[in-house]
């Protein structure tokens, strides 16, 4: 099937009431994962939200040496397909073509004017979308707004955001991540699994975990939905997502701390997880 083939048929649960993310930028390049980003962003925004469908052609050179990442004819097809997805979900949208380059810089600058950036997730190998790879790498260094790296779920699995894996490092700022997840769960009727993974052995449970369990309330269906794992955080998150059939991972990206180890956790999870990943940077202090 071509990259513009039909998206899988999934139950769609639009946001109820005021969406958590109302103004979403979707970067589309014609790949199936970028169209999945439009669909998942539309589910988050709902009819009361708005999608900006952005195709960056990254035009360089002039005359015989003029090149573009996406041809004019291809851009029209890509945006028409993306608009059809938004219309099916009854989500208002605008289509925008930006000839600027490099594409990653253009997308990240435009994302600052939105609540969320949605795009196709990068491939686990080098055989992937250059757009997704470039934007993800840049965003992990300077994430200004939350970023949703999207993957299409296999048929028969939970629909998008139906089952959320929340990865909490229990550090300062993680309570805000819990609050965001609680709002998402309330808007979409989601169940939540709370995961704390650390490679440092301890005989005590992090005090903040108990507080976060209370904050999540009935989004946690039972005690088994709270997991404490002694393992590499990236490996634990990817494995827990597989074991629990999560359809969305929510986690932080601590680029403000300048810790390469933390950044690598985000990068590995975005590349290796089977489902979409919502990355949120801690607030500026």
Per-region residue spans from a language model:
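Acidic (E/D-rich), amphipathic helical modules within compact regulatory domains
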Residues: 36, 44, 50-51, 66-67, ...
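Small/aliphatic-rich secondary-structure junction motif
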Residues: 11-69, 91-94, 160-208, 213-227, ...
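Active-site phosphate/pyrophosphate- and oxyanion-stabilizing loops and adjacent acidic/basic residues
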Residues: 39, 83, 105, 137, ...
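A short acidic, glycine-rich active-site loop
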Residues: 69-77
